[in-house]
Each structure stands twice: as structure tokens, then as C-alpha cells.
Amino acid sequence: MTKVAINGFGRIGRLVARAILSRPDCGLELVAINDLGDAKANALLFKRDSVHGNWPGEVSSEGSDLIVDGKRIAVTAERDPANLPHAAHGVEIALECTGFFTDKESAGKHIAAGAKRVLISAPAKGVDLTVVYGVNHDKLTAEHTIVSNASCTTNCLAPIAKVLNDAIGIERGLMTTVHSYTNDQKILDQIHPDMRRARAAAMSMIPTTTGAARAVGEVMPELKGKLDGSAIRVPTPNVSVVDLTFTPKRDTTRDEVNAALKAASESGPLKGILQYVTDPLVSIDFNGDRHSSSVDSLETAVLEGKLVRVLSWYDNEWGFSNRMVDTAGVIAGLL
């Protein structure tokens, strides 16, 4: 078992912990958590999740430690990752989930503290590799020390972009993610650097920015500069959907597009990552779904063979958290 620590016990940090602890075959052992929150509060928030339900086992705190089903996990409250006791706990991979240390230099503080590798749960600057599991995780090597797991939206978009670029080619495309609100927004109107995110999250549809489409170019260099997009935050707490429209390099049909996506979901590196859906579902149906991307085949459209539209759902919390675990597992195998 490879020992890992989580820095930041917020929405993603807690769900990464749930994913590790609920997947005994993942090869990872969670030995430490760093978070500035109170131990009792963290225990309660881990056990009782408004979106994903209760943890089925026992959760408590003792001193500063978290105890889950009898397993004791050391908890610290350090602001600077360089001061974390990674060496003392034998931590090999630091899972950086605060959302603050999102460049190679700042994330590298985990290495200074004794970790061997760092996986960042967000897009990051200057890192050794940006990974979307199922698309380019096979590019990971032992030389990649600080890695980004991209964003939840890039993890949804990249698999379908990969399949369709291989099958029919993508000349250029635009994506819109209709995205559930997140903690970056305000419950009621309040100052925020983005004046649209400053508005009450549960009362409006809120247009905002996303770099998810452009980030596909970091994962698939052949698509660099060919995709862009935007986001609309909506008043739901979880589950989002990517709406991709693109011009193919050759004429195609709806059946060909769906056939390519269906085949990729059934075998190869995207099996278990990409899901092909034939039922008329809605967002709540994907709450708790581990797939990165669930193609809504009923929504696929092709206009005159020259314009393609694809819709794909994703649990922006649970799916992404499981990809953190999957990518960390690949990194562990390279240590």
C-alpha cells in the first residue's frame, strides 16, 4: 500500500478520502490529513454529506485525529505545506486539494516536507504533466514529480474529444458547461473578484469563465488552440453537463458519432471512465456516478454532416475524486 496524505479537507478532499477508504483495492493508504478546520467539525462533515449521503461506517475524532471504521488518520492544521510531517508519516504521495497551491513551486513544498510525489486536484501552472485518466495517464513516468489532475470539466470533455478526434477529427469547437454551483460562489450577494459569481448562487443562472476546453490542449496537444468554452453556473448543488459543438474534419452522421462513443465506453482505456447512456435521464440521476463522462446519446445531433453536437453528464465531485484516486494509483506504481 502506498501511503498518501490529503492537504485540504473541503468538498474534494473529503470525497477523495471517501473514495480511498471505500476502495480497498485502490492500493492507497490514507495516513494523514491537513486542514485548518476543527477535528470534530471535520469528522461530522466527513460522516454527514448533504449531497452524497452518510458514510456507512463509524466516524469519530480523538484529539486532532480522525478515526474512520477504526482506522486512525493523523490530522494537522498547518498553513504552509513545507511544514507538514510527511516524512514522519512516511507519505509518498501528497494529494493537494486546497485549491491554493496550484503551481509547481508552491505544490513543491510537499516535496520539501518529505513526500515523493504531488497530485493537484485542479488545473495547475508549470507542472510536469496534466493528466486526464483514461486519455493520457499512460504518459506518466517516474520523472513526473508534480502532476495536475486537471479539472472535473476537463475530465468530462477530454474523453469525448479524444474519441471523436480519433474517429472523425475535430477542426474547431466550442463547449459550454452547465455547472452546479460551488463554494467559490456566494450564497447571498457579496463581494467577489468575478461580479457574476458575487451574486446569490441559488437564485440565478450565472455565466462565468472556464479554462476546461483550452486545457484539453495540454492533455491532447493535437487539439491545442482548437477548443474553447464558457460556463453557466446553475442552482443545483452537484452534477454538471458539457455541451460540445464542433466542426468535424469530414462529413459524419449521428449514428457514426454515437457508435464511436459507445464502442469507446465498452472497451479500451476509457471503459469505466466514459459511459454511454440511452435512457432519457436528468442531472440527479448522475449524483454519485463514478464515471468522468456520461454521454447522453439521445442528445447527439449532426447538422448536414458538418456540425456536431454532443452532450455529456458528470458528477463534478464524486467522479473527479475517483479520478484522483485512479491517477494516484498510477503514480504509486511508478515509485
Predicted segments, located by residue:
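Acidic, glycine-rich segments within the central catalytic cores of soluble metabolic enzymes
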Residues: 166, 170-237
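N-terminal Rossmann-like NAD(P) cofactor-binding subdomain of oxidoreductases
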Residues: 1-198, 326, 334-335
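Glycine-rich beta-alpha junction loops
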Residues: 36-38, 124-125, 151-153, 177-184, ...
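Predominant activation on well-ordered alpha-helical scaffold segments within soluble catalytic domains
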Residues: 13, 17, 108, 158-165, ...
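Short, solvent-exposed beta-strand edge segments and adjacent coil->beta transition regions
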Residues: 1, 143-144, 200-202, 239-243, ...
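Short, flexible turn/loop "capping" segments at secondary-structure junctions
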Residues: 139-141, 197, 234-240, 302-305
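C-terminal active-site/capping subdomain that shapes the small-molecule cofactor and substrate pocket
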Residues: 229, 241, 245-335
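Generic structural signal for well-ordered, non-membrane alpha-helical segments
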Residues: 9, 13, 103, 150-153, ...
